[in-house]
Amino acid sequence: MFAKLENLELKFEDLEQQLSSAEVFNDQDRYRKLTKAHADLKQVVDAFRRYKEMKQNLADNKELLGDSDHEIRAMAHEEIKAIEAALPDIEQELKILLLPRDPMDDKNILLEIRAGTGGEEASLFAADLFRMYTRYAEIMGWKVEVLSASDSDTGGYKEIIALIAGDKVYSRLKYESGTHRVQRVPATEAQGRIHTSAATVAVMPEAEEVDVDIRPDDLRIDVYRASGAGGQHVNKTESAVRITHLPTGIVVACQDEKSQHKNKAKAMKVLISRVLQAEQERAHSVIADARRALVGSGDRSERIRTYNYPQSRITDHRINLTLYSLDKVMEGELAPLVDALVTHAQTEALKAQADAS
């Protein structure tokens, strides 16, 4: 492990030298690539330097144990105790930082939320989830762009698809995919009975065209008249677009914009990411049906998380974490959940690494 860390530090120092060069600065494409490589290494190199400094301090204080002055020996003894207590934590941090990175972690995401079982209440919950993720994005300084939305009669969403763009979005939200279950008294419930409904969430890394090989011959593009709200524009022009990727059968439709060109661009953005997701899951031999693998069926019994409003309780069933701060979570304070899921994933990866060695 330490030989690898030494090599990373040398690489980091080499990058710093290159970045200080006027020649590199004048080549903006190269400068951006080197800046990103430098930023990717900074955290692990900073931690390694702290570790080396602590080890040096430990050695220095051990030498002081032979000093003739009693007070100096006592101070050295206390320092040694403090350093030895802190070393395991930084060693664990270094092990985590050396874990192989998910190449998708830096990407933006496509967030898809669909109402599952529970009728109109499920569509209202889908809207609540979208608001929760939007608030979290605001806290993180990310941007949210709605690509497609299908409204329900009560002001919820049957389905909504959005692009969330910013720093390392996928690394933070990739664990949100699955069925989310809600337990609460609907506004329309006269008897005050608690109902259970569900919504599915799918988080996919935003794919660029270079990530996926999609040939024009693989696409069938249909245009049709938009339906739903829209005033005089509705049914006047064929602005809605439906794109089918023939090899996979993936279909994406968009009618939110008045321009057929804009609808096509939005639909292609979603399609490319769905095809990439399907290719990745097929490559990992998860299952043939990529969409079902990602989110489940939307049935209440298949859930990754439960939101219990009467008890203000939120439980993530994958890691057995329960928090009694549902109101804060729904206002976008997702960090305690996300941090716990990231830590769990890192711990599992370390266990797998140890088992393999």
Swiss-Prot record:
It is found in: Cytoplasm. The keyword DNA-binding does not apply. Keywords: Cytoplasm, Methylation, Protein biosynthesis. GO terms for cellular component: cytoplasm. Disulfide bonds: none annotated. Methylated by PrmC. Methylation increases the termination efficiency of RF1. InterPro entries: PCRF, Pep_chain_release_fac_I, Pep_chain_release_fac_I_sf, Prokaryotic/Mito_RF, RF-1. GO terms for molecular function: translation release factor activity, codon specific. It comes from the Bacteria. The modification N5-methylglutamine is found at Q232. Its main location: cytoplasm. Peptide chain release factor 1 directs the termination of translation in response to the peptide chain termination codons UAG and UAA. HAMAP family: Rel_fac_1. Belongs to the prokaryotic/mitochondrial release factor family. This is Peptide chain release factor 1. It comes from Nitratidesulfovibrio vulgaris (strain ATCC 29579 / DSM 644 / CCUG 34227 / NCIMB 8303 / VKM B-1760 / Hildenborough) (Desulfovibrio vulgaris). The lineage of its organism: Bacteria, Pseudomonadati, Thermodesulfobacteriota, Desulfovibrionia, Desulfovibrionales.
